[in-house]
Amino acid sequence: MADRLTQLQDTVNQQAEHFCNSIGILQQCSVPSKFPGFERTGSQTPQQNQQEDYAQLFSTLISRCAKDIDTLIESLPSEESSIELQVQALKRLEIENQESAEKLEEVVRKGELLLEKIQAALSDIAQSQLDMQYSSSPKKQ
């Protein structure tokens, strides 16, 4: 997962792409303007596009991307957060990390005990099967 700054860069780049694409669509869909003293021969009818409403599409994409940019900017740490607050947050995270490590060690210890019990039970079952096979086989004399 990318950090917040990289996400912000990617979202700004995406917004720039939306702007460029919307300008390209405007150029494709626009009616050519006539300039006095300049007559051009050839087809001057714009291409008919699909029925899709490009203006609505790009306005939705651009506004959604702008909201994402605002959200990412708000999630960045501010200068107002002092060194003391950052140190307290780090200490709290270290304590949570230590507690999680202790819980993990306890779970691993219990898992190892269960594994030993299961292995002992499987060994007993295998030995019982061998004993039953040995006792039920005919003895040669």
Curated annotation (Swiss-Prot):
GO annotation terms (biological process): regulation of transcription by RNA polymerase II
Top-level taxon of the source organism: Eukaryota
Keyword set includes ATP-binding: no
Coiled coil (UniProt feature): 79-122
SUPFAM superfamilies recorded: Mediator hinge subcomplex-like
One Gene Ontology MF term: transcription coregulator activity
Main subcellular location of this protein, as a coarse class: nucleus
Gene3D superfamilies named among the record's database cross-references: Mediator complex, subunit Med21
CC per GO annotation: mediator complex
Subcellular location: Nucleus
Keywords per UniProt: Activator, Coiled coil, Nucleus, Transcription, Transcription regulation
Quaternary assembly: Component of the Mediator complex.
Family to which this protein belongs: Belongs to the Mediator complex subunit 21 family.
Function: Component of the Mediator complex, a coactivator involved in the regulated transcription of nearly all RNA polymerase II-dependent genes. Mediator functions as a bridge to convey information from gene-specific regulatory proteins to the basal RNA polymerase II transcription machinery. Mediator is recruited to promoters by direct interactions with regulatory proteins and serves as a scaffold for the assembly of a functional preinitiation complex with RNA polymerase II and the general transcription factors.
Record's protein name: Mediator of RNA polymerase II transcription subunit 21
Gene behind the chain: MED21
